[in-house]
């Protein structure tokens, strides 16, 4: 296809005149989000300056590739906003000559934000390239000169090699990008282009195509925008309308981006090929040398120069130092036209070609001095487009009050120019260069300044009338410059602005007051570099919100809401960060200041009224200019792109935040805010936003500069996940009715202090690591939040804990109140409160409670369990001096072994209904006492309005369970059985000692050792004078031991007599006789009961069951043994089916699965779930019988009472032999196996038991045709080895078991034989099993528990089929027995017979 030059005719060229905008397209791929290309062009989104390894995805979310893998993202600020030119020197741009219509350019951000103060740079000379012998390249090229130095951007360097093939070396030049603003097209997968926008509305950018050709002065690039190229995943092609747009290349050796070419030609309708002219550095050097042909330098230094001139463009410089001389110079020539057509060297590029002879006439001057130079203006000087370059230190001053205007001032690095010359009204001074411009003119300077680089020190001097103004307007742009104040009267703060990328305003120890700070982006920065003097910035807000009539009104000056998107405080560690205070002092309460940049202050932030927001900000994205149709296709909103899931996090730091009025809000996407807060005088401070709720969010529009605050629902998960939790690093002090709320996505790392009716709330999953201290009627609430610190209340303060768990200390002095609502509190130590109210809440008096909780399955150890002394052996007391009210739960840890526990001490005003949940160790008490849990703090009986009940109505300790009783106004743990047992132990021991005392022959001195024992036992008995419970409780647990009752008068008399003897005689050597004497003494001392009491005892014994009296530990031990034995019986059940079956299979497999529930008077019900029995058997048929072997493996999951989990396996090998006499069969069997059982969450060894069994069986078969009736019976003897283990300080001893299993039953079947090779046999089977002779005594600690086994019935129906040599059978059975509930199981058996 013919290549087309992107040339515009006269009308279409007039883009800057606004006549017509005809142009063709920039091509992008529709399969990739258009926003990538837009953000790329404006350095927004992911494509910020310096970004690398940027992932690019297609619209299906698939990774297309990674951009900027070998270079940092380029800074496109050097490209003019219309995209047709790029800045290559301070006032020079480069483009193509056929762009004949544009007359000016501007730089900076897109949008209508008036704070940007966008400046228009006029073309004063087009510098069109003329092809001749000295200039051999294509003449469609020019290097226009601008009337002012550009301050918004630093110029980019040009490549110098004119051989295009040089740049195909991707090792040295690994990255290429281009940018343009031609008419926009999307190319779809079929390579069809759709127009989406006209030309010159906005910029798009991406990487270039691959290099396809090159020559002297040009490069040709080609490719397909639908496919990633060598330079990245975002290829973009230009066409008509993109003429002059730049192409940049990265030099890996120099580590910098360079401008390499400008777009001139290509295939405009396909987006396949682009032709670029290489930039011509040598041509630019010619131009620059022509415009700056006067350089002044005094070899000896201290040069003195005087400039004079007139309006006709003629001037002179007189050198008074060294050898006096005069040099003629050219200045702006007011007699020349302001606008005129420039020279055109190629008629194809004819058109307006506007330039300004008047301004271009002014040349640029260069001054250099190695000491201290001096430049004097003898007349008003207008250099037009000429500027001043200074290298070295100079003083520039007028003879009297002369003025200067020109392109600007460049001060080289490490140089200082003292500037004593005022400017001209409506003229802007451009300050560039890294050096310093020290302004010391006198009076009111009516000219303005734009600072793009280096430093400007403002030290304007007052005139005779006291007038002083350094500049009428001051702007900081590009982020490279600094303006330093030498006093606070240098300018009107309403006339100061931070433009594109801003810069530093150094207060230098002085203070300024702003209504609002005009700012464009986060490049704005206010600092104080003074090392000794503090500075203040005061912001008052707009006084009026009534918009006046007139043009050019900045609407931002009449808004209630204002914003500052820059920084307060220095962030560069190489620069001094002096003390700087920020004061927000609005005139009315309805004003709002949004800080969305950041602060790094050595100083305070103070607020007196209004609303002050600290916030992150939405990530800037390029504006969406697409119409509604195209926007909907892209799935993006029209206009400004703000995605709630894509924000920039901010940080704020100050020494103190003084909120003396109004409301301060730390809003979303603040990653951290550091400093101590003092909130007073009815002020409010809010920290954090709350997911899934409405939150007030303030944002500032980058496009318009307007600030809006609105309520936003944060419900989208993607948005919520994008918001960090704000780290609040500092303390909060509240006083004088102040309020603070820390909520949602916020974490306070510091203490909170409240006085004088202040209020603090921690809520919505927020966190505080620090203490809360309340006094003087203050209130603090923790609601659904995490507080990791202590709470201390004094002077009528109130603390509420709601919907939260708290595990630190609360102390409340007189008059204070603590309220818990749907909350839990774990006390770390002893606690004293005044008033306590519970509303459906729980207080855990000891952190060890959670470690020993038996609400849920506990972690058990089969070995000795060692509990940390610091937790288990430390008991806490909660004392409530005032009133306890409400309803809730108190959780205690206890040790009945030592009669120690957490305690609750209450006043007699206490009332309410409460549950006591007590966790005890497995060790049992060994002395006769009672454990008191709740007692009166003042020895007054507790109120009858106070009620306590035990959780689950019991406490497990060792082998037994304990109840709660109220005795003498206190609440104690009580077990009648254990107390009876311990009481009887005391009686027996005391009687034995007294008997032995009577036989003592040793000296009286030896009796001293025995008396303390007797006294202690006597004291224990005296402490429990109450009538002891009936003997049946003890009988049920002590294996029918001899009945024991309370001491009668007869035993007391006998004891008294023994005591008198014991006082004289004592022989410890006779202690060995105690056990022999105990039984006899029990019989001697046991009182005779009346017939009525005896009958009542017997009836009570009949009604009581062991399972109701034993602890969880005991029940689990009995249930575990029961489950193990029942698994063994299940294996034998399957063998019973084999013995009555006439199958002749040589090998078979059997699978059976069931679910069973067991219950008895000895243990509580448990579930044997998911029992899976698998068997493999072989047998050999003999002449009159058969022999065989069966391998069985069973797995089961058991759930014991209180959800204690157990997993068990059983592996057995059995052998059998059967002999047949006619219809009579007789068989024997023998088996051996091993079981393994383990409690859930165990970390120690399993419980292993070995087992052996043998047995005999017999059956007789009656055949009535095809009907068979077979009665049978059998008996098996089992031997199971003993096993001892320990769990939670409970010692379990299981003796060896030896018991018989009896079974008898009958089987009825009927045989069908359809063919010779097929038989089908349905059957019905009834089996009775009895193992009730097995009654084991399991010992838990010292208590002997009964372990009976029962009997059960089995009813089964099944079907057996034989096809050729294969046999298959299936059955369903139901079982029920004395310990076995109604259960059913199924089985399948598959066999083969050779």
UniProtKB/Swiss-Prot annotation:
Keywords: Cell adhesion, Cell outer membrane, Hydrolase, Membrane, Periplasm, Protease, Secreted, Serine protease, Signal, Transmembrane, Transmembrane beta strand, Zymogen. GO terms for molecular function: identical protein binding; serine-type endopeptidase activity. InterPro entries: Autotransporte_beta, Autotransporte_beta_dom_sf, Autotransporter_pectin_lyase_C, Bact_Autotransporter_VF, OM_autotransptr_brl_dom, Pectin_lyase_fold/virulence, Peptidase_S6, Peptidase_S6_dom. Pfam families: Beta-sol_PIC_HAP1_IgA0_2nd, Peptidase_S6, Pertactin. The keyword Transmembrane helix does not apply. Its EC number is 3.4.21.-. Residues 26-286 form the Peptidase S6 domain. One of its GO terms (biological process) is proteolysis. Probable protease; promotes adherence and invasion by directly binding to a host cell structure. This is Adhesion and penetration protein autotransporter.
